[in-house]
Amino acid sequence: AANSIINHNKNKIDKLVWTSNTDGSKIKVQRCSTDADEGREVASTIFEIKMHEQRLNNEFAVLYRTNAQSRAIEDALRKRDISYRVYGGLSFYQRKEIKDLLAYLRLIVNPSDEESLKRIINYPARGIGQSTLDKLIIGAKKNDISLFDTIKNSSKLNLSLNRGVLSKLLDFSNFILSLQIENQKSNAFEIADLVTKKTGLVLELKKDGTPEGVSKVENVEELLNGIHDFVEGQKEISDSEINAILKKM
């Protein structure tokens, strides 16, 4: 089957692909309208074979060409409660660029999420370094308030920070607060799209012109596609929309 497909490539390098296995069943080609449909088709096929033939998960393999393609497949497998392992790379939601965008969304719905806050307070770079963060953490503990509240009130607290840094902290807290307000009237896709544009997250990734850099941009775009698909499936805008998406991921 592989050889017959390769033969259609006019620019191919001559090679013969072979296996010592016996002949298997013919390849089935299934056309899907969207990546979500493709993911559902893959997961449904695996689920049906598992049920009818009592197969184990490790008897199946899914091959895809680009990292971004794994998002729809992973989502569909999770919905079917089919456990999986990604070889030769990371799971879609374990990739740094995906974690960064999701951290912004988590912080919007929960300002007390300190891990997310620490992750993105200086990404993309906004001049808030580790020494500043250390002082903020100490200040939060000393005043028995959250890290975000410490940032929000940093100009009123004795944190030994210069005016330049205090100004950057105020800009950051105001930015997150504005997103929280926007979240009350916009859907999750609009918020996620706004975050990527306002932070310059995609522009930062585009600075890396390598194939890996291009792949990271595609991953972020695919995450936005996934959020858009989720929103389209909802009947009305809800302020818990982002929470629902984060739970799904």
What positions do the PLM features span?
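Conserved RecA-like helicase motor-core motifs
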Residues: 81-91
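A generic fold-level signal
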Residues: 22-24, 55-57, 96, 196, ...
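Residue-level recognition of hydrophobic positions within alpha-helical transmembrane segments
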Residues: 34, 93-96
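Short, flexible active-site loop motifs that bind/organize anionic cofactors or intermediates
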Residues: 28-32, 88, 123
